[in-house]
Amino acid sequence: MKRRIFTYALTLFALSASAYDITDLKDLPDHPEKGKWVQCIKVEAPRIHADLTTATPLSFQAKGMSRILVRCGKHILTPEGVNLDSEGRGRVTLNPKKLPAGPINIQIIADNAKKECDIYELQLWNAATKTARTEKGMPKDCPAVAKGMKLDFYDDFDRGLSISKDGRGARWNAHKPTFGDFSGWPFCDPSDDTDGPFVLRDGYLVIQARKKPGTRGSTGLLAPVDMDGKGYWVTPPFYMECRFMAQSAPGTWPAFWTITNIHRGPGDELDIIEAYGGWGEKNPNNTGYFTTTHYWEQKDENGKQLPGDDKLIKTDKDDTSWSQDFHTYGVYVDKDSTVYYRDGLPVHIIATNAMSFENKHVFLINYAIGGASGWQIDLERYGNRSNMYVDYVRVFTQH
């Protein structure tokens, strides 16, 4: 896990305040790459991580902006635009009956003629409806890629959470075994605090990143192996997947990944998804996510460090990103190929390294905030609060 340095075109879904046809998101204009990102959007209500129980006004200010789009996943909430007053204040009614149940992310996207732009992601919980979210919960069927395999491990977070500070006596370890925690806001032990790193709600594991005044902050990591190396390891061939959603904001760094070695020395690391949040100067400005393969401390035939593999998986305009909605991220490993998946479809394939096939893997799920990524942390306008919502994780194997 380390910082990725990259520059990509910045994609902004920006709409004028007048009426328009939004039947196809591909028709929405791209924002110029050299747009100036500014933090101008302020949400006045509802509060961050609030429950929606009835129709609720979304009140915000986007001073200096002229074009606004408000969306929830693929749902466009402002089909007739947003009228802003002279101070840039706007108001949109959030109707929970028209939104998915459970965790949702409301995106407010703004720009102006000066090419200034901003994106604000408001995480809420729709508690007013039982409207099914597509594919919510762990499917009963085996995914096509795992046909012929058996379900070897799963957690759908419907049965309580068994986790301890070192993994001993529990299903989950709250730290990376056996060394190497890497988050700027530290991965912390489980606690009964309502703002602690782990909370279960309605079949979701909520990993809560928080920074209270006077603290270094806190966030969460899960690994099914304890500090003695005991627990769940999977032997190739295997397929594993995890379904989650997080927030894109400066410093957020959700990931689902595997390692073959929990001690120092040679080992492979498969980053099934490594996502970097945040827009603007000194931020990733990334509309996709990475699949990354590391071959730690391994030499090629010339005695040089064996190069890894790094692939940006871009999010199309007519799709949703890792912060806009839930998606399932997976990896299949056999002797010949390592194939990365998103929502059951292959997105990247490489030849399997010998160490990946000949060794067992342990997987990790985490919501890092800054740290080894190298990206700045700036969650002040979110009250230094951000959540990652994990629906389930499961592993299939031939053994």
Task: Locate the predicted segments by residue.
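Short proline/glycine-enriched turn/loop motifs at strand-loop junctions of beta-rich domains
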Residues: Q61-R67, V333-K335
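Aromatic sugar-binding surface patches on proteins
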Residues: L84-T93
